[in-house]
Amino acid sequence: MQGVQEQIEELQMKLAFQELTVEELNQEVIKLNQLIANQQHQIQLLIGKLKAMEPSNIATQAEETPPPHY
C-alpha cells in the first residue's frame, strides 16, 4: 500500500506545481495584454498626429526638375 500512497503524494505535488505554473503564466498573459493595449493606443495617437500634420512645402521627388546631364 505504501507505493500507492507515494504515487498519490507525487501526483499531488505535480498538480500543485502545475497550478502554480498556470497562475504565473496567466499573470504574464495579463501583463502582455496590457502592454499590447497600451501600444495600440500609442499607435492610434501617432496615426492621429500624422493625419493632422500639414503637407510639407518641399516638392516631392516626382515634382523636382531632373538634374542636368553631363
From Swiss-Prot:
Transmembrane segments annotated in the record for this chain: none
Record Pfam families: SlyX
Xref: HAMAP family: SlyX
Homology family: Belongs to the SlyX family.
Name this protein carries in UniProt: Protein SlyX homolog
Taxonomic classification: Bacteria, Pseudomonadati, Pseudomonadota, Gammaproteobacteria, Alteromonadales
Gene coding for it: slyX
